[in-house]
C-alpha cells in the first residue's frame, strides 16, 4: 500500500492541523542554552514552513481557534478585572495605557514612514508587543465586516499582511523585552535581585526559592510544674502561644475528658494538650513544653488536618490586607496565594481581590469556618459546567453581532470584544458563585492554549505561501518598525514607573511584562531576579492588558 503523505495532508485539514501542531510543539521544546522558543512561536514557524510548501487551512477552523482563545482569556480575567482600579491598580492601568498608546502611535508613524501595506502595521504591532489579542481583534474586525476596506484593497491580501507582520515581529518583540528587562535597571545602577530583596525585607516576604510549604503537624505534651510556672496563671488568650510560635492549641485532655479550649482556658498541671503548627513552629516552643513531656495518645492526636483552596468572594474581605485575615487566630495556616494563575509571594501587605485563591491548611472544621468568612472552597471536581460555558459563548457571539448606526457609519463590537465581555462576565460570576460556570483550571488552560495554537496554525499557513516574497519586499522594513515599536514603549513605561510612580524596579519590570502580556519573559525575569516578587507587578497589569490589547487591534485596523 502506497501512501502519498503530501496529497493526504492537502486533502485532510484535520490531519494537517495536528501534524503542524505536533511538529511545532516538538520544535518548541528544543533548547539553545537557556533559550527556548515556546509553543506559540514553534507552531508559527512550522506553519509558515508548511504554508510555503503550498498547504492551506480553512477559515472556519481559524475562527474557532481565536474564538476559544479570546473567550478563555475573558474567563481568566473576570475575577480580577474590576479590582484593577483598587489601590495600586491605577498605577498598573497607567502603565498599560502608556505601553498601548505609544505602541499605537509608533505603529502608525512607522507604517507611514516605511510605506507599509494595509494591515502590515497592525500585524507588526501585535508581534512587536508579543500580544496575540491585538491580532485577534484586528482579524475579527475584518471578518465581521466592522472594518471596511478601502476601495481596491484585497481582503485576502490584508489578512496575509496581518499574519506576516505578526510572524516577522514576534521574535523581535520577545528577545528585545527580555534584554530590556535586564538592561534598564542596570543603566540606573540597580540590580533586580537587590530590588526584589528590598521589597521582601520591607514587606516581610519570604524568598520563594527558600520557602518550603509544609502541612502543619500535630504533637501533644503533658503539662508539668515547669510549664505551669511559665504560664504564671495566664489564660490561653493572654499567653498568645500562636503569636509567639505559630502553634495553636487545638485540644486538651483534662481528667480523661477531651475538650476544645477557648481563649479563657487556663492550663493545669496534668493536662495533656495537642498543638498544631509547622515543624519549625514546634521548634520555637518554650523548652518547658518539650523536656521529656511529649505524649503519644491516639485520641488526643486524632485531628483531621485539611488543606483547601479558598476563593476570595465576600465583599468585606476583598480590599483587605492579607494580614487582616488573622488566620493564626483561627488555628489556620496559609501556604500559597494565587492570583490570575500566578503564584504570589506571601506578602502580609498584599490587598486581596475577588477571585484570589488562598491555599489554607489546619484542622478541618476550622478551615471550613474560615472559608465561610473569606468566600468558598474551590470545587475539586474534574467536571466542567459546559452548559454555562456554551451559553455564554453563544451570548458573546450575539453581543458581537449587535451594530449601531450613526448616520452613514455603522459600528459594532465584533466577535472578539463580544466574547471578551461574555467571558469576563462568566469569570466574574464564577468567582462569586462557586457552583456556577465551573471549569477546572487545567481544562481552561488546555482550551485556551489549543485555541491559540490553532489560530497560529491558520496564521502561518495563510502567510507562508508568500513568505519569501514578503521578506524580499518589506521584511527589513517590518523588522526595523518592530524593533522601534517593541523598545520605545517599554522605555517610556519604565521612565513613568521609575520617576513618576516611584515604583520598586522589580515590581515595575513585572508590571511592564504584564502590560506586554508576555509570559515567557516573566519566567526569565523571575529566574534573573531569583524571586517571584516581579510576579506581583505582572499580575497587576496582565488582566487589563489582555482586554485593552484586543480593543487596540480593532482600533488599529479601523484607523489604518
UniProtKB/Swiss-Prot annotation:
InterPro entries: AAE_transporter, RCK_C, RCK_C_sf, Transp_YbjL_put, YidE_YbjL. The keyword Repeat applies. One of its GO terms (molecular function) is monoatomic cation transmembrane transporter activity. It is found in: Cell membrane. Gene3D superfamilies: Regulator of K+ conductance, C-terminal domain. GO terms for cellular component: plasma membrane. PROSITE patterns: RCK_C. This is Putative transport protein VSAL_I2029. GO terms for biological process: potassium ion transport. The chain crosses the membrane at residues 14-34, 37-57, 66-86, 94-114, 161-181, 386-406, 409-429, 451-471, 478-498, 539-559. The lineage of its organism: Bacteria, Pseudomonadati, Pseudomonadota, Gammaproteobacteria, Vibrionales. Belongs to the AAE transporter (TC 2.A.81) family. YbjL subfamily. Residues 203-292, 293-376 form the RCK C-terminal domain. It comes from the Bacteria. It is a multi-pass membrane protein.
Amino acid at each position: 500500500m502506497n501512501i502519498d503523505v503530501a496529497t493526504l495532508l492537502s486533502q485532510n485539514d484535520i490531519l494537517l492541523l495536528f501534524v503542524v501542531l505536533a511538529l511545532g510543539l516538538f520544535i518548541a521544546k528544543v533548547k539553545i542554552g537557556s533559550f527556548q522558543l515556546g509553543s506559540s512561536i514553534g507552531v508559527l514557524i512550522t506553519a509558515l514552513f508548511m504554508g510555503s510548501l503550498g498547504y492551506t487551512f480553512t477559515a472556519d477552523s481559524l475562527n474557532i481557534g481565536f474564538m476559544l482563545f479570546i473567550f478563555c482569556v475573558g474567563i481568566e480575567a473576570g475575577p480580577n478585572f474590576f479590582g484593577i482600579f483598587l489601590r495600586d491598580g491605577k498605577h498598573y492601568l497607567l502603565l498599560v495605557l502608556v505601553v498601548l498608546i505609544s505602541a499605537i502611535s509608533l505603529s502608525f508613524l512607522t507604517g507611514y514612514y516605511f510605506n507599509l501595506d494595509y494591515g502590515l502595521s497592525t500585524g507588526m504591532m501585535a508581534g512587536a508587543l508579543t500580544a496575540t489579542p491585538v491580532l485577534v481583534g484586528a482579524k475579527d474586525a475584518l471578518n465581521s465586516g466592522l472594518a471596511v476596506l478601502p476601495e481596491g484593497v484585497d481582503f485576502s491580501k490584508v489578512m496575509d499582511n496581518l499574519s506576516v507582520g505578526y510572524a516577522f515581529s514576534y521574535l523581535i518583540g520577545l528577545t528585545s523585552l527580555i534584554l530590556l528587562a535586564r538592561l534598564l535597571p542596570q543603566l540606573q545602577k540597580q540590580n533586580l535581585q537587590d530590588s526584589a530583596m528590598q521589597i521582601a525585607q520591607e514587606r516581610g516576604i519570604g524568598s520563594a526559592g527558600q520557602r518550603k510549604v509544609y502541612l502543619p503537624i500535630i504533637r501533644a505534651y503533658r503539662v508539668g510544674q515547669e510549664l505551669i510556672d511559665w504560664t504564671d496563671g495566664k489564660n490561653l488568650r493572654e499567653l498568645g502561644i500562636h503569636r509567639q510560635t505559630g502553634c495553636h492549641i487545638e485540644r486538651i485532655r483534662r481528667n480523661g475528658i477531651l475538650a476544645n479550649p477557648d481563649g479563657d482556658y487556663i492550663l493545669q498541671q496534668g493536662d495533656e494538650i495537642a498543638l498544631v503548627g509547622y515543624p519549625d513552629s514546634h521548634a520555637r516552643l518554650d523548652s518547658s513544653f518539650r523536656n521529656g513531656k511529649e505524649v503519644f495518645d491516639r485520641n488526643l492526636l486524632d485531628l483531621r488536618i485539611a488543606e483547601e483552596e479558598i476563593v476570595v468572594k465576600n465583599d468585606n474581605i476583598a480590599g483587605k490586607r492579607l494580614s487582616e485575615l488573622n488566620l493564626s487566630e483561627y488555628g489556620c495556616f496559609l501556604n500559597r496565594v494565587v492570583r490570575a494563575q500566578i503564584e504570589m509571594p506571601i506578602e502580609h501587605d498584599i490587598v486581596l481581590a475577588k477571585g484570589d485563591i488562598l491555599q489554607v491548611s489546619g484542622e478541618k472544621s476550622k478551615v471550613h469556618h474560615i472559608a465561610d468568612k473569606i468566600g468558598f472552597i474551590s470545587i475539586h471536581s474534574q467536571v466542567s459546567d459546559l452548559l454555562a460555558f456554551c451559553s455564554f459563548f453563544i451570548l458573546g457571539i450575539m453581543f458581537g453581532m449587535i451594530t449601531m448606526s450613526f448616520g452613514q457609519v455603522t459600528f459594532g463590537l465584533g466577535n472578539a470584544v463580544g466574547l471578551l465581555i461574555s467571558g469576563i462576565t462568566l469569570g466574574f460570576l464564577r468567582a462569586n458563585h462557586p457552583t456556577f460556570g465551573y471549569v477546572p483550571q487545567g481544562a481552561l488552560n488546555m482550551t485556551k492554549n489549543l485555541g491559540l495554537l490553532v489560530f497560529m496554525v491558520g496564521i502561518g499557513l495563510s502567510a507562508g505561501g508568500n513568505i519569501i516574497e514578503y521578506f524580499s519586499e518589506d521584511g527589513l522594513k517590518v523588522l526595523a518598525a518592530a524593533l522601534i515599536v517593541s523598545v520605545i514603549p517599554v522605555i517610556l513605561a519604565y521612565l513613568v514607573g521609575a520617576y513618576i510612580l516611584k515604583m520598586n524596579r522589580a515590581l515595575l519590570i513585572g508590571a511592564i511584562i504584564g502590560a506586554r502580556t508576555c509570559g515567557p519573559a516573566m519566567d526569565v525575569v523571575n529566574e534573573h531576579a531569583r524571586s517571584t516578587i516581579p510576579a506581583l507587578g505582572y499580575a497587576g497589569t496582565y488582566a487589563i492588558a489582555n482586554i485593552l490589547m484586543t480593543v487596540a487591534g480593532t482600533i488599529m485596523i479601523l484607523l489604518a
